[in-house]
Amino acid sequence: MSDQVVLLHGLGRSCASVARLQSGLEEMGFAALCWSYPSRRRRLAGHIEAFREWLRRQAFAGPVHFVGHSLGGIIIRGALADTPPVAIGRIVMIASPNQGAGVVSRFGRWPFSRAIFGLPLQDLGEKSPALMSLGVPEAEIGIIAGLRHFHPLNAISYVNLFHRAGHQHDGTVELANTQLEGATDSIAIDAHHTFICDHDE
């Protein structure tokens, strides 16, 4: 039987944003599926509990691997940190703000920000209590971070032109803030936060 992989997309995205990853995993022989969730409509704790409940309803045979982009990686981390509902294989977190995102700390309270990005924004600022209270799953965890600051199709890129000079970041999350104590490995690639899942590497 093929190893099973569950993918989670990021905030404001859909499973289409990780479709290339999913196809690549399937070509490699994995049984891959994506959990689709209404990313703007719940705070972080609500997403974590919804994902845990979804996992409990699945009939997985053997350990399950997980791949999460941005918020998706944080949800995976929270759902699997304590008494995980399934046997865990490996975890890959792609551009996930484990220590929060500075741009959220600076602009997350603005009404337009919450209108666009929804409820989770309250929990994704640097050192937010919701993030700092999360544990770390007992599993091999790989972190992939991006280093491309600007993409013309990403609105936050234009904000960052004036507010993030001198920092290594992917246009949304600082490189340092993707890191997680207890992670097995970490790499950084020349990719922008929003489009990192389509990067050739």
PLM features: what roles do these ranges have?
Residues 20-21:
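Short amphipathic alpha-helix
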Residues 5-11, 16, 25-138:
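Serine-dependent carboxylesterase/thioesterase catalytic core
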Residues 1-3:
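A short, charged/proline- and glycine-enriched loop
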Residues 81-201:
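Helical cap/lid subdomain of alpha/beta-hydrolase-fold lipid enzymes
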